[in-house]
């Protein structure tokens, strides 16, 4: 089992799929990382040699991933809330940000229904 960016990658999966278990690396970026590192994306993680794992680590290290990315996103949201702009207010109230309707729907963002008290 390879460990990259503080994440244990599943040994039985292909490299490009396993890299996606790192927060901040999706389908496109994982394929790009494999290509630049010179690793076949369809190789199973358990079959990787130590130099290949090191090349992947070096390539993933060029991106902001995992805890740093989560922190950066949190700081950006906090900044919006401190500014008091529309998006910040929507974050503060737990409502959708991008113009979706809220009279019906938006249950994921609003949470479970609250009964109306008479």
Swiss-Prot record:
Signal peptide: none annotated. Keywords: Ribonucleoprotein, Ribosomal protein, RNA-binding, rRNA-binding, tRNA-binding. One of its GO terms (cellular component) is small ribosomal subunit. Residues 96-118 are annotated as: Disordered. One of its GO terms (molecular function) is structural constituent of ribosome. Pfam families: Ribosomal_S13. PROSITE patterns: RIBOSOMAL_S13_1, RIBOSOMAL_S13_2. InterPro entries: Rbsml_uS13_C, Ribosomal_uS13, Ribosomal_uS13-like_H2TH, Ribosomal_uS13_bac-type, Ribosomal_uS13_CS. Belongs to the universal ribosomal protein uS13 family. HAMAP family: Ribosomal_uS13 (MF_01315). Part of the 30S ribosomal subunit. Forms a loose heterodimer with protein S19. Forms two bridges to the 50S subunit in the 70S ribosome. Located at the top of the head of the 30S subunit, it contacts several helices of the 16S rRNA. In the 70S ribosome it contacts the 23S rRNA (bridge B1a) and protein L5 of the 50S subunit (bridge B1b), connecting the 2 subunits; these bridges are implicated in subunit movement. Contacts the tRNAs in the A and P-sites. This is Small ribosomal subunit protein uS13. It comes from Stenotrophomonas maltophilia (strain K279a).
């Amino acid at each position: 089992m390879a460990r990259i960016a503080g994440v244990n990658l599943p040994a039985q999966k292909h490299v490009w799929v396993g890299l996606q278990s790192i927060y901040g690396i999706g389908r496109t970026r994982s394929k790009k990382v494999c290509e630049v590192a010179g690793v076949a994306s369809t190789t199973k993680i358990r079959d990787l040699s130590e130099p290949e794992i090191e090349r992947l680590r070096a390539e993933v290290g060029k991106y902001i991933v995992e805890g740093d990315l989560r922190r950066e996103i949190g700081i950006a949201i906090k900044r919006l809330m401190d500014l008091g702009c529309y998006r910040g207010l929507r974050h503060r109230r737990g409502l959708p940000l991008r113009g979706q309707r809220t009279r019906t729907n938006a249950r994921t963002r609003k949470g479970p229904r609250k009964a109306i008290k008479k």
